[in-house]
Each structure stands twice: as C-alpha cells, then as structure tokens.
Swiss-Prot record:
It comes from Tropheryma whipplei (strain TW08/27) (Whipple's bacillus). One of its GO terms (biological process) is glyceraldehyde-3-phosphate biosynthetic process. Its main location: cytoplasm. Involved in the gluconeogenesis. Catalyzes stereospecifically the conversion of dihydroxyacetone phosphate (DHAP) to D-glyceraldehyde-3-phosphate (G3P). This is Triosephosphate isomerase. The gene is tpiA. It holds the Pfam family TIM.
Length: 293
C-alpha cells in the first residue's frame, strides 16, 4: 500500500452512504441539439419507470460541444441527471490549443470528468516547445496525475479509467499502472506549493487513503465488444483497487441491456460505465430499469 499522503479526500463514511451510479459515455456521438431531446426523453422515461434518483445516480458524458446545452436544460427543467466531460487538460490555462481546462468544465456545472480512458491513452503525445509539455510527453501516468489534480482544484470529481492497454496484459500489469498514477499524484502533491496553490482553501488535506474520485475498470478486450469481462475478474479487480486506496469502483466495457444488471448488482462494485448501449435514450432507460428493479 502506498504511504500516507496529503490528498483531497471525502469523509471516512462517505462511500458507505453514497448511492450507486449508472453513467453513459456518449463518446463522439449525439450533437448539441440532439442532446437536448435525448435528455428530455431519458428524464421522462426514468420518471415514468419510477426511478429512485436517491437510490441510484444517473450521469451522462456528452461531447464538449454539448455541455452548454446540457447545462441549460438540466438547470431550467430541474432534471436530476448528473453530467460530466470526457476529458480535461492537464493545464490550468495558457497556450494549449484545443484543450479544455477543469475550470471551464466547472463553469458549465460539470460534476464529473473522465480521465485516462483507453481511447484517450492510445492517442500519441505530441512534443511541444513548452518545457512542461515536454516533461509530460510520453509519460501518460504523469499526465493523468496532473489532470486529476486540475479536477480536484476545480471541485470536479474525476473518474479515473484503468485497464489493460492490450488484451495480452495481465491483472498485475493493470494494477501496476494504477499504482503508477497514484505515485505520480503523490510526487506532484509533494512538490512545494503545487497543491496548496492549485487548490487554495477550497479543499481540506488529511492523511488518508481515501481519494475524492472514482475508478472505472475497463479491460480493453471488453470495450466495444458487446461482452463484459468475466464477473470473477471484475470483482477481483474491484477488491484489489479498494485494497490499494479507498475509492468507489465502476465497471465499463461491453455493458448492455442483457448483462448490465448482473454487473451492476455485484456487491463490490459501485456502478457501471456504459458506452454504446447508452446512445439511445429509450434503450438506456430500459437498461437502467433492469439494474434498479
């Protein structure tokens, strides 16, 4: 287990009190106008199904260009669906063309942000003139750690995605990468002024192994396959993650209407991250209903 550290944390009993979550990652689907009709339909279908929002949180992850439309609709119609972004910059501001800062996402009332998704990790890191970019170039775990800290600073809950980079990877390799991200996070946190300056007085620091984030386990062999990983492997991974640090764990990869309930209702899991099966509001509502019966 990693040594005690000063990280942004939640109260010690928070995880036992928090509800499970079903999240839909839209990826590069559904434009800003479609997002409005999608959320309206999903909301009334959930209400019509008698969904208990106090027992199970529903969240969606639209493309960046949809977020303002989603924010406006959720606020105006008092919709009880959470939302977040699919990625965030490792930098707070500056000359970083095409990147979106955590504070920009906070200004759009994002509750969550996905970090380290396998479809992002496979993108090449291009070198730049900025020394900070060069330092992070080809160091994905360090980059991810910086994104986590920017999210903490903005008051957004990150969902750290971990999994084998290739189907040939093993259980221990996935956990090794998770430990590597945490080690980078600790190293950055220990640098003079880096955390205090970034987070100011908004976040308290305690010696704790409980991070204010979620972890989504997404094995590459299951993503976009339509088939979940073996339930035994999922539970084993969730237990191992929670043994390293006290976080809520989601499962993602091949989740669909027919397997979602079995995965969602595993005792060690705190929810599921759904991809393709969340792109149709009616289908997603049906999936949610099967999980929450």
């Amino acid at each position: 287990m990693l040594p005690k550290r000063a990280y942004p944390v939640q109260d010690s009993n928070v995880h036992s009190q928090e509800k499970k979550i079903i999240a839909g990652n839209w990826k590069m689907n559904i434009n800003h106008s479609q997002a409005v009709s999608y959320l309206q339909e999903l909301n009334w279908r959930l209400i019509d199904n008698g969904h208990d929002f106090d027992a199970c949180e529903i969240a969606v992850f639209p493309p960046f260009t949809d977020l303002r439309s989603v924010q406006t609709l959720v606020a105006s119609d008092d919709i009880q669906i959470s939302y977040g972004a699919q990625d965030v910059s490792a930098f707070s501001d500056g000359a970083h063309t095409g990147q979106i800062s955590a504070q920009f996402l906070k200004d759009l009332d994002c509750k969550y942000v996905l970090i380290g998704h396998s479809e992002q990790r496979c993108l090449p890191c291009y070198p730049g003139n900025n020394s900070a970019i060069n330092e992070l170039n080809n160091k994905h775990d360090g980059l991810i750690a910086n994104k986590l800290l920017r999210s903490f600073a903005a008051g957004i809950c990150p969902i750290l995605c971990i999994g084998d980079i290739s189907p040939g990877d093993h259980f221990d390799a996935t956990l090794s990468r998770f430990r590597s991200v945490l080690s980078h996070l600790k190293a950055i946190s220990d640098k003079k002024h880096s955390i205090g300056y970034a987070l100011g007085s908004k976040t308290h620091f305690l010696d704790s192994d409980q991070l204010h984030m979620l972890v989504a386990y997404e094995p590459s062999s299951a993503i976009n396959s339509g088939n979940c990983a073996n339930s035994g492997d999922i539970v084993r991974m969730a237990a191992a993650i929670k043994d390293i640090v006290n976080v809520r764990v989601l499962y993602g990869g091949g989740v669909n209407l027919f397997n979602a309930s079995a995965v969602f209702n595993e005792d060690l899991l705190d929810g599921i991250l759904v991809g393709r099966a969340s792109l149709n509001a009616s289908d997603f509502a049906s999936l949610i209903k099967t999980c929450c019966l």
